UniProtKB/Swiss-Prot annotation:
Record-listed Deamidated glutamine modification sites: 237, 281
Oligomeric form and interacting partners: Homodimer. Isoform 3 exists as a homodimer.
Phosphothreonine PTM positions: 151, 154, 169, 214, 229, 232
Tissue-specificity statement: MBP isoforms are found in both the central and the peripheral nervous system, whereas Golli-MBP isoforms are expressed in fetal thymus, spleen and spinal cord, as well as in cell lines derived from the immune system.
Compartments (UniProt record): Myelin membrane
Chain segments carrying region Induces experimental autoimmune encephalomyelitis (EAE) 2: 246-256
Disulfide bridges in this chain: none
Name of protein: Myelin basic protein
Positions carrying Phosphotyrosine: 148, 203
Residue numbers of Omega-N-methylarginine PTMs: 177, 183, 241
Chain positions with Symmetric dimethylarginine modification: 241
Disorder association: The reduction in the surface charge of citrullinated and/or methylated MBP could result in a weakened attachment to the myelin membrane. This mechanism could be operative in demyelinating diseases such as chronical multiple sclerosis (MS), and fulminating MS (Marburg disease).
Segments for region (Induces experimental autoimmune encephalomyelitis (EAE) 1): 179-222
Length: 304
């Protein structure tokens, strides 16, 4: 126990001596920092920053390891002197050009960056006022009118969706006319059978969830639905019947080629009234049982 107590006292004495030496070293470091600040008054940007931050570790190393350099504080700062322009010219160029609160003597020939920006704004002030109006109307995310001038092209308009919006409306109008308006033309024009008025009334009275394609659905949805399915039948336009009929009558085309619209309309009606006809309408009833009630996934074209 006595040995342990003696060791503890020795450790305490060592700690006190170490703290005293550390205090002396810290005072020396402060003196070094003050001397470096006084010697680097001609360069205020580097003086305080390098004395505190950049060269702090190097001064600590020299103060602890080498006693000769700590005795002479000038030698301790000769390796990386903050006011020496020859040792670090890139930092002098970086800090002394547009440093706040400094009058620049190094780059008198070249104007500063802020002056260049101001001259550019003054030169383009007359033209950028009208462009700012255009840019605020057409491109609200754009900040400068000059950039709008540089990128004013059809691709730029297409990126922001102005030209294709008008073009796509024409395309979609034609698609909507093909899907919606022209669908009724062959039904009215072909008076081949007695199922004709019943079928048109049946189309109107159907609930929109019950068949695979709603009558008043968005033509954009039809357009993309028919593009995604690989076997869209474009010759159905030339055959003289609407796309809705070719959509619902594809299952019976190969089996009963001789029938006209009446047979297919009766198939269509019976398939929706509870799937009663099982003898010749088996394929259609199966298809509409599988996916006829979902207008997106139950398109018969996708199952062909």
């Amino acid at each position: 126990m006595g040995n342990h107590a003696g060791k503890r006292e020795l450790n305490a004495e060592k700690a006190s001596t170490n703290s005293e030496t550390n205090r002396g070293e810290s005072e020396k470091k402060r003196n070094l920092g003050e001397l470096s600040r006084t010697t680097s008054e001609d360069n205020e940007v580097f003086g305080e920053a390098d004395a505190n931050q950049n060269n702090g570790t190097s001064s600590q190393d020299t103060a602890v390891t080498d006693s000769k350099r700590t005795a002479d504080p000038k030698n301790a700062w000769q390796d990386a002197h903050p006011a020496d322009p020859g040792s670090r010219p890139h930092l002098i160029r970086l800090f002394s050009r547009d440093a706040p609160g400094r009058e620049d003597n190094t780059f008198k020939d070249r104007p500063s960056e802020s002056d260049e920006l101001q001259t550019i704004q003054e030169d383009s002030a007359a033209t950028s006022e009208s462009l700012d109006v255009m840019a605020s109307q057409k491109r609200p995310s754009q900040r400068h009118g000059s950039k709008y001038l540089a990128t004013a092209s059809t691709m730029d308009h297409a990126r922001h969706g102005f030209l294709p919006r008008h073009r796509d409306t024409g395309i979609l109008d034609s698609i909507g006319r093909f899907f919606g308006g022209d669908r009724g033309a062959p039904k009215r024009g072909s008076g081949k059978d007695s199922h004709h008025p019943a079928r048109t009334a049946h189309y109107g009275s159907l609930p929109q969830k019950s068949h695979g394609r709603t009558q008043d659905e968005n033509p954009v949805v039809h357009f993309f639905k028919n593009i995604v399915t690989p076997r869209t039948p474009p010759p159905s336009q030339g055959k003289g019947r609407g796309l809705s009929l070719s959509r619902f009558s594809w299952g019976a085309e190969g089996q009963r080629p001789g029938f006209g619209y009446g047979g297919r309309a009766s198939d269509y009606k019976s398939a929706h009234k509870g799937f009663k006809g099982v003898d010749a309408q088996g394929t259609l009833s199966k298809i509409f049982k599988l996916g006829g009630r979902d207008s997106r996934s139950g398109s018969p074209m996708a199952r062909r």
